């Protein structure tokens, strides 16, 4: 699969295009009287060094673009790469099955866990079917049903957050979007099993929080977590979405800032160039963090889990 490069990655894209061109020539005529392999190797090293240099100094807006990268791994990619025996469960038992939320039982190193996450979709038809990862109330009610099932069977809950936000359509509001989100916040704070949440892409507002109340909250290195998109913030404060880069910096949407504010617990490093460059390596790092988190939580009693979660929530907003 060829990589899609973002605007700030154009110098890397140019180098990679040269590498691809030389590689194609080499395949067409193996009798060329020049050492193409040596030149390709030199360019690859230069590309890696350039990538390292660019990614060492990314701003919040550039990270926001990476969080939305169309080739970035989604929930079902991590399910495939890091878990075994996934059985998807569907429907909220009241209205419909929202494809923007996926969930089911799987095994993490042999241990049964409940997985719940946003799913955006790749191709146009799938994006529409999954509503671009923006859940309706039935999606959050499905998530709550699966959480309650996990509690009943004493299974840890693992959530993957990747949404621009809850769907703001008229139908969603009529079916109780705000109530569904609020109920999830309340019920997640009361769950008697370990809950580990990880932001894998965009963590957009209440749509993210509705599956984001946990004992451990992680973020991938190039993910974002915010109350509104940078474009939305810029439109409100500066009356222009063009100010999105300025808004992104001011909002503190990136993992290091959120860890500094004690809103998250861990930052999971991504492969050089982002998770989409090496999904397998990213999944391995994510899996290792999940296993570490569950080991830390396994020693706590049900009451300890609830009390710690309550104290965590009550600490928000204090300097």
Curated annotation (Swiss-Prot):
Enzyme Commission no: 2.1.3.15
Instruction: Kindly give the PROSITE patterns that the UniProt entry links to this protein.
Output: COA_CT_CTER
Quaternary form?
Acetyl-CoA carboxylase is a heterohexamer composed of biotin carboxyl carrier protein (AccB), biotin carboxylase (AccC) and two subunits each of ACCase subunit alpha (AccA) and ACCase subunit beta (AccD).
Q: Name one Pfam family in it.
A: ACCA
Q: Where found, per UniProt?
A: Cytoplasm
Single Gene Ontology MF annotation: carboxyl- or carbamoyltransferase activity
**General function of this protein:** Component of the acetyl coenzyme A carboxylase (ACC) complex. First, biotin carboxylase catalyzes the carboxylation of biotin on its carrier protein (BCCP) and then the CO(2) group is transferred by the carboxyltransferase to acetyl-CoA to form malonyl-CoA.
Q: What is this protein called?
A: Acetyl-coenzyme A carboxylase carboxyl transferase subunit alpha
Matching entries from SUPFAM superfamilies are given as: ClpP/crotonase
**HAMAP family per UniProt:** AcetylCoA_CT_alpha
Record pathway: Lipid metabolism; malonyl-CoA biosynthesis; malonyl-CoA from acetyl-CoA: step 1/1
Leading EC class: transferase
Question: Which catalytic reaction applies to this protein?
Answer: N(6)-carboxybiotinyl-L-lysyl-[protein] + acetyl-CoA = N(6)-biotinyl-L-lysyl-[protein] + malonyl-CoA
Name the family the entry cites: Belongs to the AccA family.
Say where the protein is mainly found. cytoplasm
Arranged from A to Z, the UniProt key words for this protein are: ATP-binding, Cytoplasm, Fatty acid biosynthesis, Fatty acid metabolism, Lipid biosynthesis, Lipid metabolism, Nucleotide-binding, Transferase
Gene Ontology cellular component list:
acetyl-CoA carboxylase complex
Q: Could you mention a single GO BP entry for this protein?
A: malonyl-CoA biosynthetic process
Q: Give all residue intervals belonging to the CoA carboxyltransferase C-terminal domain.
A: 35-296
